[in-house]
A protein has these predicted regions:
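Sec-dependent N-terminal signal peptides of Gram-positive bacterial secreted proteins and lipoproteins
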Residues: 2-22
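Membrane engagement elements in two modes
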Residues: 17-209, 215-267
Length: 267
């Protein structure tokens, strides 16, 4: 009788161990630590996407613009975020802004003027966004700017806030739009987030620039990341990407982000 009891207990322990192993199924559509290799997609969350994220297209061109009206370039800032990070090369001031093309023609940003309040001290910077001449934003679309500035006098973790003033100019229509989907985030130790996903395009392009804005459950901007994928696209294929965002060490970004907005440019 004792032997039978021991046998039954062993069987129950084995069954319990198997159940625990099944709970550890990968949450990634693309494994960021394995060169983009595919993992078990059956274990992925539902249609809301990566770790509960909802991918909201930032590209929503307005259909009401009068093609015969005189060009009237205009943008409106819709959200900002600011932090003092402990960067790889020392304390780093970071700022990001989301903006909408509220005019009636395609635009580019020609200058971004940022005003920071860091622990009660004011800082002001102006810069021209990366590849600004290529980043054409259509009427009704949302896009982003992001800024990093090393400053050894700052203390990482100090409370920071920012306002932004953006100058824009009329631009020609964008040649190629790049799309990002299946975006997954994972918070890693010590203090950075990995992002994976898939890029596609509506035409041929050799280079690209992609902006991704992270939003919380109240639709407040948490931060912005931009990157390029060194891979030509012809409009019929897709390319996976995997990025360790070590220069955006927002604590618990994957946990805080409820949705992302994406805009991509091909050229």
């Amino acid at each position: 009788m004792k032997r039978l009891t021991v046998f039954i207990i062993c069987i129950l322990l084995l069954a319990s161990g198997c159940a625990k192993k099944e709970e550890k199924a990968s949450l990634f559509a693309v494994d960021p630590l394995n060169g983009g290799a595919k993992t078990d997609e059956a274990a992925l969350p539902g249609p809301k996407g990566a770790a509960g994220l909802e991918t909201v297209p930032a590209a929503e061109p307005a259909s009401t613009a009068d093609p015969e009206a005189a060009p009237s370039p205009a943008v409106a800032v819709t959200g900002t975020a600011a932090y003092v990070f402990d960067g790889a090369e020392g304390p780093t001031l970071y700022g990001a802004a989301a903006y909408e093309n509220t005019g009636n023609c395609p635009v580019i940003i020609t200058n971004a003027a940022l005003s920071f309040n860091v622990g009660g001290t004011a800082y002001q910077y102006s810069f021209v966004p990366i590849m600004n001449d290529k980043t054409v934003v259509l009427p009704g679309e949302t896009s982003f700017v992001a800024f990093w500035h090393k400053d050894s006098s700052l203390t990482p973790g100090t409370a920071a806030a920012m306002t932004a003033s953006l100058d824009c100019a009329k631009a020609e229509c964008r040649d190629v739009t790049v799309y990002a989907k299946d975006i997954f985030l994972a918070d890693n130790y010590p203090g950075f987030t990995t992002m994976t996903g898939t890029l596609s395009s509506d035409g041929e392009c050799d280079l690209n620039l992609v902006y991704i804005g992270f939003y919380d459950s109240s639709d407040n901007l948490i931060g912005v990341w931009h990157f390029t994928k060194n891979a030509p696209m012809d409009g019929s294929d897709s390319k996976s990407f995997s990025i360790h965002m070590k220069e955006l060490p927002i604590d618990g970004l994957a946990e805080k982000a409820a949705s992302v907005k994406v805009i991509g440019i091909g050229f």
